[in-house]
Regions:
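Gly/Pro- and small hydrophobic-enriched strand-loop and loop-to-helix capping segments
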Residues: 208-224
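Conserved alpha/beta-domain cores
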Residues: 1-191, 196-206, 220-221
Length: 224
């Protein structure tokens, strides 16, 4: 499996580089977040052996089961939390994750700020924007995103560095990428986490700094 994952990583990286160059951007301006959710630690280790270092997990509990041992072997790995975060998992998330991409409500932001103050660890945070205003999804609606950014950054004191979105499956993602880019521009935020296996090249055209790719690297979920 190691050879397959290494080949997949190289293929995705080539596509990222080509998309960046087509958009007039430097290839190294786009970070590939390899989404390892539901895949075993062995698959992550194969990606690490191939030289990749940035990974994304949806659930703190799953990340706790995989990443402490991997970090011992590869201390330069970076772990992004890309799934919804419950307030009762905040302490674990701050301790384990290097970036938290899914800040989406004041109560969570306040809990994160308290834990960062307590622990002295301040992982960069992104605010998740529900660009499609889908009731079943987490994320702040675009209509209140500007105010929420100000609240998190200025009143609560979180290290907000950018925005993240997951467009609706049945809509043209470019519209959502453009919207996220505009909200980030208004607030002076530099990081844009958007684009997945099916649409990351389009996201790069709209300014993505981080693309979250799982299936194109590790295969269908849980295949390992």
């Amino acid at each position: 499996m190691e050879g397959v994952i290494a080949a997949n990583l190289a293929a995705v990286r080539r596509r990222i580089d080509a998309a960046a160059e087509a958009a007039g951007r430097a290839p190294n301006s786009v970070t590939l977040v390899a989404v390892s959710k539901t895949h075993p630690a062995a698959s992550v280790r194969d990606a690490l052996a191939a030289g990749h270092r940035v990974f994304g997990e949806n659930r703190v509990q799953e990340a706790q089961a995989k990443y402490p041992a991997l970090r011992e072997a590869f201390p330069d790995l970076a772990l992004h939390l890309i799934g919804p975060l419950q307030t009762n998992k905040v302490r674990d998330a701050v301790a384990l994750c290097d970036v938290i991409e899914t800040v989406d409500r004041p109560r969570l932001a306040e809990a994160l700020a308290r834990e960062m103050e307590r622990s002295g660890r301040r992982p960069p945070c992104l605010i998740e924007v529900n660009t499609g205003e889908e009731p079943q999804k987490s994320g702040v609606f675009p209509t209140v995103a500007d105010d929420f950014i100000i609240e998190c950054r200025d009143r609560i004191g979180l290290p907000i560095m950018g925005l993240m979105c997951v467009p609706p499956l049945d809509e043209e993602p470019a519209l959502h990428f453009a919207l996220l880019r505009e909200i980030a521009r208004r607030s002076g935020l530099g990081l844009l986490s958007m684009g997945m296996s099916a649409d990351f090249e389009k996201a790069i055209r709209f300014g993505a700094t981080h693309v979250r790719v799982g299936t194109a690297i590790f295969g269908a979920r849980g295949e390992g």
